[in-house]
Amino acid sequence: MPTWRYSVELEPERTAKASLRDVSMSYKLTVETLRLIKGKSIEEARRILTEIAEMKRSVPLKRYNKKVGHRSDVPGPGRYPVKVAKNLLKLLDNLENNAEFKGLNVENLRIVHAAAHKGMKIRNYLPRAFGRATPYYDQLVHVEIIAREVE
């Protein structure tokens, strides 16, 4: 069994952690969405992700934005990563439950660390004409979030 670690170790008595491992969703859109919710409270992050899942708010793309159309609610290119938002909402629920278990005040938590890491690639094949086959890959993603209690 592999052991999972977090890429950052913060003070354990004032922080709550949660992670998703080997999730099939877009790595690039996950990075952009995590950039949007970092530094926010859990309730504010939940509201933002719910709006993204309902396609009422788009995620501004800062890094992975080649050939992407502009959106009216953000300055510049943006997308609506619904699958990413739904998975991150589950992760926020997990983070909140972990904080309650540790006895932290959930209203005073701020997301101080949010990171996505590339996981394993799953190779599949698409049959083509004349007996050929084309491989295509599914990139899995690891996500970790750490929230700290702020006075």
Curated annotation (Swiss-Prot):
The keyword Phosphoprotein does not apply. Gene3D superfamilies: Ribosomal protein L22/L17. The keyword Ribosomal protein applies. Keywords: Ribonucleoprotein, Ribosomal protein, RNA-binding, rRNA-binding. GO terms for cellular component: cytosolic large ribosomal subunit. One of its GO terms (biological process) is cytoplasmic translation. One of its GO terms (molecular function) is rRNA binding. Part of the 50S ribosomal subunit. This protein binds specifically to 23S rRNA. It makes multiple contacts with different domains of the 23S rRNA in the assembled 50S subunit and ribosome. The globular domain of the protein is located near the polypeptide exit tunnel on the outside of the subunit, while an extended beta-hairpin is found that lines the wall of the exit tunnel in the center of the 70S ribosome. PANTHER family: 60S RIBOSOMAL PROTEIN L17. Belongs to the universal ribosomal protein uL22 family. This is Large ribosomal subunit protein uL22. It comes from Thermofilum pendens (strain DSM 2475 / Hrk 5).
